[in-house]
Regions:
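A solvent-exposed, charged loop/short amphipathic helix patch at secondary-structure junctions
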Residues: 4-32
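Hydrophobic targeting segments
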Residues: 7-12, 24, 44, 52-58
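Short loop/turn segments at strand-loop or loop-helix junctions that form parts
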Residues: 9-20, 58-59, 86-90, 160, ...
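Active-site-proximal specificity loops/subdomain of glycosyltransferases
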Residues: 20-26, 58-127
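Short, acidic, metal-binding catalytic loop of nucleotide-sugar glycosyltransferases
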Residues: 28, 39-51, 73-78
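Conserved catalytic core of nucleotide-sugar-dependent glycosyltransferases
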Residues: 99-121, 138-218
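The conserved acidic donor/metal-binding loop of glycosyltransferases
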Residues: 132-136
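C-terminal catalytic/acceptor-binding lobe
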Residues: 189-303
Length: 303
């Protein structure tokens, strides 16, 4: 039987996701790009299977952002194949009511996929792997994903366990989530992937926790990912309840991070003060000042 042709995207939703309308200012963006370059890119360069494209997604507003332009130019100097789109977030955003979220996703897919069609080319299937901008995959992950999705009985695949790393200190521990983590891949027929309504109908996933509710989901009970913490995460911190036993830093060789070093980010007085508080208090303050106050002011300015 002839092997099916695939296009494999590792999709990084850089802006458009989370608090503050998905963009927390240029200082945040500079720091996140630093994390991306120092940790995520080495892990991608270390992949044993090179047949993939890094798809970096942005809001339309970032098309002319000098930090985004610099990152795009820098990536073009690396061996990685990459493409940037500016159509917004290309999976379900559960901050909105279902009808609004579905409409926004359809629009974002339409705007983004039109820039992917030439890159996709003449293939049978498109694989879409979620690649967060501050987390990493093991160096055999792409090969493992592609091999697993040759099976006809599954159309999605993910890893159930991983590691968690404090990028600032270099500490690494096991990471044992009790729900499906956001490290999964969906296998689309090309014709379905490129049509927004069919795309959404095929994979109506409102959260990574529910992938198995909608797709024939295969999982690997191995530690295939590394969650990175750096002090600017929205929901994950090093002493998370899912954190397990400490592990030796030798494990970083499995992720291409043996030479990554530790992360040095400038910390404002406001953040120093915030970090003195319990994490739950920090999240509540971010929500109140970010979502309830700044976002309303931002929307007022745009109206």
């Amino acid at each position: 039987m002839e092997e099916k042709k695939i296009k494999h995207f590792l999709y990084t939703p850089f802006t458009g996701l989370g608090l503050y309308g998905g963009f927390r200012g240029n200082r945040w963006l500079r720091n996140r790009i630093k994390v991306f370059k120092q940790f995520v890119i080495p892990s991608l360069l270390a992949q044993t299977e090179k047949n993939f494209t890094l798809w970096v997604g942005w809001r339309p507003e970032e098309r002319s952002n000098p930090h985004v332009i610099e990152l795009k130019n820098w990536l073009e100097t690396t061996p990685l194949k990459s493409i940037f789109t500016y159509g917004g977030l290309c999976f379900w955003d559960d901050k909105f009511p279902d009808d609004v979220a579905k409409s926004r996703l359809a629009t974002n897919l339409h705007l983004s996929i039109r820039d992917l069609v030439d890159e996709i080319g003449d293939v049978d299937y498109v694989l879409m792997t979620i690649q967060p901008s501050d987390d990493c995959y093991a160096s055999n992950a792409v090969a493992t994903i592609q091999d697993a999705l040759k099976r006809e009985d599954i159309n999605a695949f993910g890893f159930t366990k991983g590691y968690i790393m404090n990028y600032a200190t270099g500490e690494v521990s096991e990471y044992n989530p009790n729900t499906n983590p956001p490290f999964y891949t969906i296998k689309f027929k090309k014709s379905v992937f490129i049509e927004p309504q069919e795309h959404i109908q095929f994979a109506p996933i409102k959260s990574h926790e529910y992938v198995a509710n909608h797709l024939r989901y295969g999982v690997l009970d191995e530690r295939g990912f590394l969650v990175g913490t750096h002090g600017e995460n929205v929901s994950t911190y090093y002493n998370h309840p899912f954190k397990g036993n400490w592990v030796d830093k030798e494990i970083l060789w499995n992720f291409g991070l043996q030479n990554a070093g530790t992360l040095k980010l400038p910390i404002s007085l406001r953040k120093r003060f915030m970090r003195m508080m319990p994490y739950r208090v920090q999240r509540k303050l971010r929500y109140w000042f970010g979502e309830l106050i700044w976002n309303r002011f931002y929307e007022y300015l745009r109206s």
